[in-house]
Amino acid sequence: MIRSSFVRSLPAVLTAFVIASCSGAGGVDSTGPLGQSPDATATAGSGLELNALWWKDWHRDVVTVSKTIDATGGTISIPETGLTMTFPQGAVAAPITITVTSDAEYVAYKMAPAGTKFLKDVIVTQSLSTTEVAGETLKRQLSAAYIADDTVSLSGKVPVSEIEPSYTTFSAGSSPLPLAHTWIIRHFSRYMLASG
């Protein structure tokens, strides 16, 4: 009986150990969402330029999803790109139709209505299985970046306005691979996943 209990809990213990060991010195924080801390704030990106991540399959179809979110909260997902947005209860005071459009080449999204501000943090999770880093070890830390100008090209170095509080989730094992990147947003318009 004790042995079967130990065997059942072993995967959870090993996962916790791997996560703890990955959060030490090095690039990526995989410990938990910074958005859960009241002190977590976006970092001003003034003068900062980053490279947008590419989709794994070039020239991916642009996907647009719309959904009405009300004061009870809700979720918007784009399965084709691996995006999930979770709106907690109280994020908006009144019903609002949210539209999210993926970029054809880069791991980036336009979110509307532009200028929308949220009363509570919205949690965004991007599966990395659809991106250029799928199945690869990370060479550089990933960042979720806000781009104030919806018309700026995402090719090359992209000027960003904010770096959002975020973390990367990794697989367990001797060579952890990135699985997803999660960040918080407090307002809309355009966001991308990027590296330095």
Residue ranges of model-derived segments:
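Bacterial N-terminal signal peptides that target proteins for export
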Residues: 2-11
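A mature extracytoplasmic/lumenal domain signature
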Residues: 91, 104, 128-130
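C-terminal motif of bacterial Sec signal peptides marking the signal peptidase cleavage site
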Residues: 18-21
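Short edge beta-strand/loop segments characteristic of extracellular beta-sandwich folds
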Residues: 86, 125-129
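Short beta-strand elements of extracellular/lumenal beta-sandwich folds
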Residues: 104-112
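Proteolytic cleavage junctions
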Residues: 23-84, 90-98, 114-119, 132-196
